[in-house]
Curated annotation (Swiss-Prot):
Domain notes: Comprises two domains: an N-terminal domain containing the nucleotidyltransferase activity and a C-terminal HD domain associated with both phosphodiesterase and phosphatase activities.
Residues at which CTP binds: 8, 11, 91, 137, 140
Reaction(s) this enzyme catalyzes, per UniProt: a tRNA precursor + 2 CTP + ATP = a tRNA with a 3' CCA end + 3 diphosphate; a tRNA with a 3' CCA end + 2 CTP + ATP = a tRNA with a 3' CCACCA end + 3 diphosphate
Protein name stated in the entry: Multifunctional CCA protein
Entry note: cofactor: Magnesium is required for nucleotidyltransferase activity. Nickel for phosphatase activity.
Cystine residue pairs: none
UniProt xrefs under PANTHER family: MULTIFUNCTIONAL CCA PROTEIN
Family, per entry: Belongs to the tRNA nucleotidyltransferase/poly(A) polymerase family. Bacterial CCA-adding enzyme type 1 subfamily.
Domain HD: 228-329
CDD domains documented for this protein: HDc, NT_ClassII-CCAase
UniProt keyword list: ATP-binding, Hydrolase, Magnesium, Metal-binding, Multifunctional enzyme, Nickel, Nucleotide-binding, Nucleotidyltransferase, RNA repair, RNA-binding, Transferase, tRNA processing
């Protein structure tokens, strides 16, 4: 039996890109051979085994044949006669169809090294079209390797367009779409993922709420980039640049969905777009089964981001109620995530990317002020329901004093 390192580890090794996961393919072995050597079986659909010591995955070389729609619509065949070339041809991109043996020798039957050198993402064979998830994977690779200058081969982009138009993407489960998208959102250039999906026509099928933003105008005095879709991707760039969490990145992505629902006669103004956005954000989250915590922040940012931009002019009571809705006393980290998302929105505008956003520091200081006021600060004779009422009163008074101090400093 022969063992080869395959896939992403070889690709990233040749690129000089860091990698962690290692996947191996085993040629000329049977499940019985693997079990006899102490490997643990883990594959449900096809024979995959864990190494007894390293726990790394070893899969028997296999071929596959399309038998139905979607990601799981395949029949697999594994046998000692299946060659390395047979196994590699079923992979998505040439740069992922390179293998390395235990002596470090490279096997590259489909030109992956040449495409690595020329910075091209190219499909291995027409079998690429049999798995709709590959459209999302290529978009994610386009985002990951954007800093290296990689481009999608024209024939691959055309095939992705054909797949998007065919309706095959409808067979993808919400879990698979979210898993691939959440991974893409954590890339340093996540905006390229969504731009690629738009370029191949997949965005309107998978994320119609986001696709609808493109071509919708905004007031140029506030948004020099004008287009709502471009603003969304520029805001996402800011979140990636700051290395913010998945929750923040997703909230930034969907914060302006309501602008796609602005009546035509009101354009380019978007009055009440925050309220209009609640329904499409909720629909998108429920359709993709987005985790609850991620959904909650997205809805908060959608509903409240204008209040953050206007925070220094808010009345103390209004600011307290905003902080309360963000669960400031129990979850200060959520307030921080909210501030981060709002700052990305403010900086996701053409020519304003480096403009200061003092609202962020104001919000953080306000959060610390209300959190610093405890029951122990109240008069001893306060009892029962009065405790909660007086705590609120103290916090609002403290916010009023903070606002006055801030205004005095800004006018001095």
């Amino acid at each position: 039996m022969q063992v080869y390192l395959v896939g992403g580890a070889v690709r990233d090794y040749l690129l000089g890109h860091p990698y962690q996961e290692k996947d191996y393919v085993v040629v000329g072995a049977t499940p019985e051979h693997m079990l006899a050597q102490g490997f643990q079986p883990v594959g449900k659909d096809f024979p995959v085994f864990l190494h007894p010591e390293t726990k790394e995955e070893y899969a028997l070389a296999r071929t596959e044949r399309k038998s139905g729609q979607g990601y799981h619509g395949f029949q697999f065949f594994t046998d000692t006669t299946v060659s390395l070339e047979d196994d590699l041809i079923r992979r998505d991109l040439t740069i992922n169809a390179i293998a390395m043996d235990q002596d470090g020798k490279i096997y590259d039957p489909y030109g992956g090294q040449n495409d690595l050198e020329n910075k091209i993402l190219r499909h291995v064979s027409e079998a690429f079209a049999e798995d709709p998830l590959r459209v999302l994977r290529v978009a994610r690779f386009a985002a990951r390797y954007f800093p290296y200058g990689f481009q999608i081969a024209p024939e691959t982009l055309q095939l992705m367009q054909t797949m998007a138009d065919s309706g095959e993407l409808d067979a993808l489960t919400p879990e698979r779409v979210w898993k691939e998208t959440s991974r893409a959102l954590m890339e340093n250039h996540a905006d390229i993922y969504f731009q690629t999906l738009r370029n191949c026509g997949a965005l309107k099928h998978l994320f119609p709420e986001i696709d609808a933003l493109f071509g919708v105008p905004q007031r140029p005095e506030y948004h020099p980039e004008v287009d709502c879709g471009i603003h969304t991707l520029m805001s996402l760039q800011q979140a990636c640049k700051s290395n913010y969490s998945l929750d923040v990145r997703f909230a930034v992505l969907v914060h302006d969905l309501g602008k796609a629902l602005t009546p035509a006669e009101e354009l380019p103004r978007h009055i009440m777009h925050e309220e209009r956005g609640i329904k499409p954000v909720t629909q998108l989250c429920e359709r993709l089964r987005v985790p609850t915590q991620t959904k909650q922040l997205a809805l908060s940012v959608c509903k409240e981001h204008l209040k953050c931009h206007q925070i220094m002019s808010l009345k103390p009571g209004t600011l307290w109620r905003l902080l309360q809705r963000l669960d400031v006393l129990r979850r200060p980290e959520r307030v921080e995530a909210f501030v981060q998302a709002c700052e990305c929105d403010a900086k996701g505008r053409l020519g304003l990317e480096d403009r200061p956003y003092p609202q962020a520091q104001y919000m953080r200081e306000a959060m610390q002020i209300v959190r610093s006021i405890k029951v122990q600060d109240l008069p001893e004779n306060i009892k029962g329901a009065e405790i909660g009422e007086m705590l609120i009163q103290y916090r609002i008074e403290a916010l009023a004093e903070f606002k006055n101090q801030h205004q005095s400093l800004s006018h001095s």
